Amino acid sequence: MSQPKRRKLESGGGGEGGEGTEEEDGGELEVAVPRPRRTRRERDQLYYQCYSDVSVHEEMIADRVRTDAYRLGILRNWAALRGKTVLDVGAGTGILSIFCAQAGARRVYAVEASDIWQQAREVVRLNGLEDRVHVLPGPVETVELPEQVDAIVSEWMGCGLLHESMLSSVLHARTKWLKEGGLLLPASAELFVAPISDQMLELRLSFWSQMKQLYGVDMSCLESFATRCLMGHSEIVVQGLSGEDVLARPQCFARLELARAGLEQELEAGVGGRFRFSCYGSAPMHGFAIWFQVTFPGGDSEKPVVLSTSPFHPVTHWKQALLYLNEPVQVEQDTDVSGEITLLPSQDHHRHLRVLLRYKVGDQEEKTKDFAMED
């Protein structure tokens, strides 16, 4: 005999200490109990566990834009790496460490906090590099190296650059282990923003207005409901766009130099900047997209290598981070869009991204929206 269906409701308001609500269905009651807030250590352990599975590493290495950029960025710096020591922060399966060894590094310390370090050690052994690539299990904040290093390599970027990123770990390693004037790969990051018209979202919003023609049932009243469901939230949406979705010339609103002193404090306070756009033409504006690029120094007389996640470039596994308005706003050619954007750590989870957006479209009043990246 099947159990009666029960529906659990979230505690009112979503805040701490809110009273749980209950609902009767089939004669049973169930009270929603707010989950206890995890400690920073517990959140870190859950974060590391995510990287113990092969799927996440498959997705990253299968991203040819990402992996080729790292390989080229490392190999172009062969003159600076030859005979030197390198620290790979968050080494994963060890592929970047092996690239460094192929570039001539004398010793590579591959530090990995998740259990995938065991597979990394096997990969290193399979490639006959165990004498030069040393896999060290544990967070870089606690691992001890036998020496200072000449270079640090890390693929630390997350969605929107800073969500679940390891940048704080890289900066810790830089301060503790990198020799003065040492090499950082990549060396800098830039954040971009642009207003967008999301063609996929527009199709979903207009879907309900097509039902009368398709099935003889007028369901157009659901379009406003769909708008509230799909846009009236505060979640950062990770989705790939094309250049055709971009409504104005993108602008860089923040630049991070990884060697810069005080960068840790800047990140805690929030990085961002103001923007002003003039729209290309007539379209429904659904919100803003943010993306990033990182740059590897070019080495001796070589061009720098740029890894871009722009919608005007081939798609990467990072895609773009979308910030939807509460409803579409019609813009025309030369419509002015202005405001300010700030990226900072979530108050609830130090690894999660929060985005504060203040914006004004045309003659409309200025509005604000506070976004977060969900688990």
Swiss-Prot record:
The gene is PRMT6. Keywords: Chromatin regulator, DNA damage, DNA repair, Methylation, Methyltransferase, Nucleus, Phosphoprotein, Repressor, S-adenosyl-L-methionine, Transcription, Transcription regulation, Transferase. This is Protein arginine N-methyltransferase 6. It is found in: Nucleus. Its EC number is 2.1.1.319. Arginine methyltransferase that can catalyze the formation of both omega-N monomethylarginine (MMA) and asymmetrical dimethylarginine (aDMA), with a strong preference for the formation of aDMA. Preferentially methylates arginyl residues present in a glycine and arginine-rich domain and displays preference for monomethylated substrates. Specifically mediates the asymmetric dimethylation of histone H3 'Arg-2' to form H3R2me2a. H3R2me2a represents a specific tag for epigenetic transcriptional repression and is mutually exclusive with methylation on histone H3 'Lys-4' (H3K4me2 and H3K4me3). GO terms for molecular function: chromatin binding; histone arginine N-methyltransferase activity; histone binding; histone H2AR3 methyltransferase activity; histone H3R2 methyltransferase activity; histone H4R3 methyltransferase activity; histone methyltransferase activity; protein-arginine N-methyltransferase activity. It comes from Bos taurus (Bovine). The modification Asymmetric dimethylarginine is found at residue 38.
